[in-house]
Amino acid sequence: MMAPSIDTMAEELDTSITESTMALSVYLLATAFGPLIIGPVSEIYGRKSIFHITNIWFLVWNLVCGFAHSKGLLMAARLLAGFGASAVYSLGYGVLGDVWSAEQRGRSLSLYLLIPLTGSAVGPIVSGFIVKYSTWRWMFWSTAILQLTLDLSSLLFHESYAPLLLRRRAEELRSNTGGSRYHAAIEMREAGLSPPRKLSRSLSRPLRLLAFHPIIQMQAILEGIDYGLLYFALSSFSALHVAAYGESVEISGLHYIVICIGTVSGSQLCGPLMDYAYQRLSSNTGETQVPELRIPLLLPGALITPIGFLLYGWAAQYHLIWVVVDVGAALLSLGMQIFDTTLHAYVMDSYPEHVSSASAATQVLRSLLAFAFPLFSNSLYDSLGYGLGNSLLAFLSIGIALPATGILWRWGATLRGRQQSSY
């Protein structure tokens, strides 16, 4: 949402463009480390309570952003707001894994992703008009008003984490019957562990997954590069239309509609196709609950993404009509969304009891690269231009995605079989 207002904020707060871009990117830095705490803690205390706490945290610091009168306070508040918002990266996928079966994974992901993906594209459009007719501070205040509404509606949510619900049920049965024979599986597994030991073991889980589980390592690298490249290309998307096509800030923000079209189309196409392909492959092979049956859908995403990069880059390089640039950006976001949605489903299938921790582990590299890549986008495009610059990104994307798809399809089950327990 901040992208169209970077120049305005830089002027008012007396910062450089790089420093203003840092205020945009530091939010992503928080989303790298927030899930490392939020995800595993939700597997101890439940999704519901952690969800309420992080919602309030985000609301408070988002308001502070709107009142910031120095670049230091703005960056600090953005960092802390990002920590609260990062809950969605672990709790969201955790709830999906709690509620929907593997056969419904695609449908649940497509429904879940619809609103955040739409919001990520509509946000810059709205902020462009806010900057034009009001002040950039209302970007944060209006978001806080919406967040307050969502916080109130979230009071209707129920706990969904099965191990915690079973623990509570076992405790209730022991209390009501006076017997000690009722125990949940998680209680048996954690027998003899002190509360600090349980907490430390849970908090270390995402890092243990990232350090010792090849599946998590591969997804972290793939999603990190994908997400970083997307932010790299799109961090200058609005500025391109202002500089090359002479558009105003608020009109340039309208071009983010094509990003919305690409990402939403990717998620909504991928969901039903994923469920259909999974059920068809399960029927043909006679195997069920095999995460590798998700892998074939990575291929179209891996191929569409570089096409989008090339079209976007060379159309911008030769100042072709803006429609061509936008089609390239739409294809780029479409391919990446198909690829990332499929990867998420694969990891959710691989770690059904620790979806939040697994999502947190993969989120680290994803957010770090999304934080770092935009800092160098202006330098790359100034040196190589949009054509060669995006060609480099296209070859990097396909050069990593295609081999990784083959490795997961051929050796994914073997890698999963050799990994340590996620407990």
From Swiss-Prot:
Keywords: Membrane, Transmembrane, Transmembrane helix, Transport
Subcellular location: Membrane
Topology relative to the membrane: Multi-pass membrane protein
InterPro entries: MFS, MFS_dom, MFS_trans_sf, Sugar_transporter_CS
Biological-process GO terms, alphabetical: export across plasma membrane; xenobiotic transport
GO cellular component terms listed in the entry, alphabetical order: membrane
Induction of synthesis: Expression is induced by the developmental and secondary metabolism regulator veA.
GO molecular function, one term: transmembrane transporter activity
Spans through the membrane: 21-41, 49-69, 79-99, 111-131, 138-158, 220-240, 256-278, 295-315, 319-339, 360-380, 392-411
Family designation: Belongs to the major facilitator superfamily.
PANTHER family noted in UniProt: MAJOR FACILITATOR SUPERFAMILY, MAJOR FACILITATOR SUPERFAMILY (MFS) PROFILE DOMAIN-CONTAINING PROTEIN-RELATED
Protein name: Probable efflux pump mfs2
Organism of provenance: Aspergillus flavus (strain ATCC 200026 / FGSC A1120 / IAM 13836 / NRRL 3357 / JCM 12722 / SRRC 167)
